[in-house]
Amino acid sequence: MNKKVKIIGAGLAGCEAAYFLANNDIQVELYEVKTLIKNEVQKTNNFAELVCSNTFRSQSLLNAAGILKAEMRRLNSLVIKIADSCKIDGDDALAVDREDFSKKLTDVIKNHPNITIIEQNVSYIDDENDLTLIATGPLTTNELKEDIQRLIGKQKLFFMDASAPIITKDSIDFNKVYYSGRHKQGKYICCPLNEQEFNKFVDDLVNAEQVQLKEFEKSIFFKGCQPIEQLAKTSKKLLLKGPMSPNNLLDQNNQQPYAVVQLRQDDAKDSLYNMVGFQTNLKWPEQKRVFQTIPGLEKAKIVRYGVMHKNYYINSPKILNFKLQVIRKKNVFFAGQITGVEGYIESASSGIWAAINILAFINNKKIKPLPNTTILGALTNYITNSKIYSLKPMKCNLGILEQENKYQSNDKFYSYNNSKNSLENYIEQLNKILRTNI
C-alpha cells in the first residue's frame, strides 16, 4: 500500500497523528485552512491553537486527566511533550503559555522531513483512493461538513448546541430517589421535589452566574435550545410542563410529587447518568452548587458539566469502529473533537490512537482494541460503543474505566497502576506486531 496519509486539520489530534505517522516513516500531507479562512475563535496562524483554557488539567494520578496524560507520555505524545516544556505555575495543573505552546508545536510539525503542509480548504474526501484522517474539530468548514455528510449520511452528523451534566450513579442518595418512567420510556431515576424545594431550586437557578456567550454563539443557541435557567426565567410552568414534569412518575407510595428531575442511564456499564432536559449555560461551580440542592443529589459527582457552544461531531457509535475507522469506508479515519471526545487531551490522545490504527492498516496488520482499563481505551470504547443510543461529547473520567477490583483494593492509585500495567502489556504486543518502538 502507498505509504502516504492525508490528514485534514492541524489541531491537537491532527498534529499528534501526523507526528506519530511521520516518525514511523509514513509520508504525511497535513491540510490546514486557517490561513485562508478564519473562524470565530482563532487568534493566530499557528497549529493546535488553545482557544479556550490554557490548561491541560490536573497532573494528579488520582484522577482521569492525570492518568490520561501519563498514558500519552508513554505513547510519546508530542502535545504533552511541548506542554511540559511550556509549563507555567498552575497548582497541580499542566497550565501552559498558549502562544508559546502553539508556536513550538507548529515549528516541530513544519520542520519534520516526512510532513508536508498544504494550506487548502478541503471540500471533498476521495474515500476510494486516498487514505485520509479527518481531524477538523468542532468548527469544521461548511464545505467540508457537507462532504462529510455525503460520506457518512446526512442524518449522522450532529450539531450540538447544548448538553446536560452527567453524574456518577454511586454518588446518588438512593434513600431519596426512586425508579419510574412514563409509558414506554423505561425506568429512569427520579429525584422528587415538593413545592417548597422546587421554588427554592428555581430561585437558586435563575440567580446563578452564567457563562458569557460570544456574539456568534448567541445567534445560534437560543433559537432551538433553551437552557434550563432560561426556561426558569421565562416561567416556572415551563419547567413543570417540561423537564421537571411529574406526570405519571409515581413514587414508592403511589403518589405524584410536585416536581421531578429525571436521570437517564448514559453508558452501557450503568455507572453514569445524565440529567434529562438540563442543558445549561451556568458556570461549572454554579452547576455543582445549584444542582446539589436537588434531593438525592446532595453529594452528586459531576463527571461532565453542561456546556453550550457550537460543535459539530459525528454519531461515532454508528459510524466508527474501535480503530476510529469509518465502518463502510475503510480508507477514512476520524480523530479529535469531531468524534465526540471533549477536551484538549482527549482530542490529542484520539489522534495518537487513530495514527496507530492507520499504521496497522498500511502494513495490513490486525491489532486489538486498547484495554478498557486504560483511560484512552475506555474513552474510545465510550464513543464507538454501538449500544449508546445517542452520543454526547465526553471528557475523560474514572466512571468509564473497567476496574472490577477497585473497591477491594487499598491502593489509592489503583486506577493509575491498573492503567499503567495494562498499557505496558499492550505496547509490548503492539511493538511486536507493528515493529515500532513506542
UniProtKB/Swiss-Prot annotation:
Pfam families: GIDA. It is an enzyme of class 2 (transferase). FAD binds at G9, A10, G11, L12, A13, G14. Its main location: cytoplasm. GO terms for molecular function: flavin adenine dinucleotide binding; tRNA (uracil(54)-C5)-methyltransferase activity, 5,10-methylenetetrahydrofolate-dependent. It catalyses: uridine(54) in tRNA + (6R)-5,10-methylene-5,6,7,8-tetrahydrofolate + NADH + H(+) = 5-methyluridine(54) in tRNA + (6S)-5,6,7,8-tetrahydrofolate + NAD(+); uridine(54) in tRNA + (6R)-5,10-methylene-5,6,7,8-tetrahydrofolate + NADPH + H(+) = 5-methyluridine(54) in tRNA + (6S)-5,6,7,8-tetrahydrofolate + NADP(+). Its EC number is 2.1.1.74. Catalyzes the folate-dependent formation of 5-methyl-uridine at position 54 (M-5-U54) in all tRNAs. This is Methylenetetrahydrofolate--tRNA-(uracil-5-)-methyltransferase TrmFO 1. It comes from Mycoplasma capricolum subsp. capricolum (strain California kid / ATCC 27343 / NCTC 10154).
